[in-house]
Amino acid sequence: MQQRVIVGMSGGVDSSVSAALLLQQGYQVEGLFMKNWEEDDGTEYCTAMEDLADAQAVADKIGIKLHTANFAMEYWDRVFEHFLAEYAAGRTPNPDILCNKEIKFRAFLDHAMTLGADFIATGHYARRAETAYNSKGEAYAPLLRGLDNNKDQTYFLHAVHGREINKTLFPVGEIEKPEVRRIAEELDLATAKKKDSTGICFIGERRFNDFLKQYLPAQPGKIVLDNGKEVGEHHGLMYYTLGQRGGIGLGGMKGASEGAWFVLHKDVTNNRLVVGQGHDHPLMQSTQLWSESIDWVAGEQNIPAEGLRCTAKTRYRQPDQACTVFIDENSEHGVRVEFDEPQRAVTPGQSVVFYSDEVCLGGGVIHHTNAPTPNFI
């Protein structure tokens, strides 16, 4: 009997080719287009209808049914409110990670099961290993890096539990992006030449500062140098991220050298933005970070007393960094990560993700680091 797969079809080339490949592999395939954001009608940002039309065109071309589902309420409650709270607290969140955990691999998976699916599939560049069992006897599938190292998306998938991965297929995870484009062109799919989306998960390509302003009041404050000297005003700490180059508004400052300006520190208590010159400024350097809660793909924490040797990324596409992970005795579920080499601009609110060779072990949100605090704070 054919196994039934529901493919999350976004209107992009990766999910389009995923559906086509699964058909070729003999699965009974249907698509599902998720609407996860209520667009402001008539705005320039309204891409959801275009994406739905593209997904429908592909479904028609390859001869499969396309379902639609609206998860906008779930997205608002489980992802967007957290996103706003993090920005309000002066941190820089990554909503795509929470969106994958709560929407694409929970709300979508649950909905697909009501449609009689054996598996869901997505267009992510990741792979899964054969079903394994943790020490509690729970079945899960280990998460593996995508074959195309340049496109690997396990950084964004680390918070998805292995039991959900066990119900998921990643058809394009086994091939490289140029091959995906080639397959789409060969099959004459409407999405073959469509550019990859880069906006916030489900919110699209809108101007970020304008978008954030609609939900959080801007709180302007002082810009200060690393010695505490006031040199200007910022528009609100939420618009800046640690290590950011430029966009600070200090070009041509009298008496300053020609070098670029970088965001070194966000003094949330006093609403001050600390800036300085030098790509590797000491205030941006850290060797340790703390995370208060870790999502382990296997559903359990296996950190020996002497620490877990592995590699980690603190941002997407960063080369793997050697580290040791320790249980944080001061936190119920947290860890302390000690890097072999100093790290630049590790950003609270972003995620640290752990790897053992090809296997993505899991990760968590960065709470704080041991980067030095400016001496005037």
Curated annotation (Swiss-Prot):
UniProt catalytic activity: S-sulfanyl-L-cysteinyl-[protein] + uridine(34) in tRNA + AH2 + ATP = 2-thiouridine(34) in tRNA + L-cysteinyl-[protein] + A + AMP + diphosphate + H(+)
GO MF term (any one): tRNA-uridine 2-sulfurtransferase activity
Main location group: cytoplasm
GO biological process, one term: tRNA wobble position uridine thiolation
Signal sequence segment: none
Binding site for ATP: 8-15, 34, 123
InterPro entries according to UniProt: MnmA-like, MnmA-like_C, MnmA-like_central, MnmA-like_central_sf, Rossmann-like_a/b/a_fold
CDD domains: MnmA_TRMU-like
Enzyme type, top EC level: transferase
Intracellular or extracellular location(s): Cytoplasm
Annotated stretches, region: Interaction with tRNA: 151-153, 315-316
Keywords: ATP-binding, Cytoplasm, Disulfide bond, Nucleotide-binding, RNA-binding, Transferase, tRNA processing, tRNA-binding
GO cellular component terms listed in the entry, alphabetical order: cytoplasm
Protein's UniProt keywords contain Zinc: no
Site feature: Interaction with tRNA: 124, 350
Enzyme Commission number: 2.8.1.13
Taxonomic superkingdom: Bacteria
Pfam families registered for this protein in UniProt: tRNA_Me_trans (PF03054), tRNA_Me_trans_C (PF20258), tRNA_Me_trans_M (PF20259)
Disulfide bonds: 99-201
Residue span of region Interaction with target base in tRNA: 94-96
Active site (catalytic residues): 99, 201
HAMAP family found in the cross-reference section: tRNA_thiouridyl_MnmA (MF_00144)
Homology family: Belongs to the MnmA/TRMU family.
PANTHER family, per the entry: MITOCHONDRIAL TRNA-SPECIFIC 2-THIOURIDYLASE 1, TRNA 5-METHYLAMINOMETHYL-2-THIOURIDYLATE -METHYLTRANSFERASE
Name of the featured protein: tRNA-specific 2-thiouridylase MnmA
Species of origin: Acinetobacter baumannii (strain SDF)
